[in-house]
């Protein structure tokens, strides 16, 4: 199995401030770790060069007014909200990030690789058609999925496992029955959306599946969600392409969330996603980097685990350094599983009228 990795040094130049959670070290430390592990020397890994997304592709998702605003503000610097500034030059870097997602999908379709990981920034899943938010400017995932729809795909499944609900992606596909949007996210947490009752409108009713996770949810809880919700729905939907919004802020060392996933947990989630892609879509799968702010304690190891699972490497050695593990004992809560079981039943109740697997 060959896995493509999209990366460009330009992604390291985006910076709101040196102390902002979404800073260059998120990717810089990861790339150092991947090089140290010899990932790029493997015949199973191919490095892919991104290109800038075209305005035509961006306008499939975002309004012309917002795109014009972002382009103009990017020339002098500006602000969207209290945690999302517009640094000088961000428009071109956001285009390169969105184009990186498209490049990953293109490589899979062209059979340059079986699957691909777009290691891009700035992230995108909070960006809505008319405005950016939550460190995001352009919705990379939505732009890629719209591009795939134009290639003729009729059923695409998005799995967003970022700790924060992908409200932008949800809004963009909320009334579209061609796109199954599944989100697992901590609740309560920014942006305050993603309740089970948010399940789509019009033709898209039933095609948005939100699974709130209690603080303290760890590997066992995530596997329970895959077993009881995600796999049954995906099996019934039968996607032709699977896209992963691969946020990594659900790690137990992340400074702005309260979940307890481990690097091995990420690897196992991706292994399960790859298996679903092999079952339904000839292996076609693209992961797109979203959040994740533990630049030393998590990202180098979680990204390694994700790539190892995508490329079919042995996962037995995927783990964090032992000095980080005491924080896992502090973060993980057994009570979270009890609450999660109730949440899972709520999701099944809401979606029982849409999916046979829950009847």
Swiss-Prot record:
Cofactor: Zn(2+)
Catalytic residues (UniProt): 126
Record's keyword terms, sorted: Hydrolase, Metal-binding, Zinc
Molecular function per GO: histone deacetylase activity; hydrolase activity; metal ion binding
Entry annotated with the keyword Metal-binding: yes
GO biological process, alphabetically ordered: epigenetic regulation of gene expression
Top-rank taxon, per record: Archaea
Cofactor detail note: Binds 1 zinc ion per subunit.
Polarizes the scissile carbonyl of the substrate, annotated site positions: 293
List of residues binding Zn(2+): 162, 164, 249
Pfam (any one): Hist_deacetyl
EC number: 3.5.1.-
Similarity section: Belongs to the histone deacetylase family.
Functional note: Probable deacetylase.
Matching PANTHER family: HISTONE DEACETYLASE HDAC1-RELATED (PTHR10625)
Name of the featured protein: Probable deacetylase AF_0130
Organism from which the protein derives: Archaeoglobus fulgidus (strain ATCC 49558 / DSM 4304 / JCM 9628 / NBRC 100126 / VC-16)
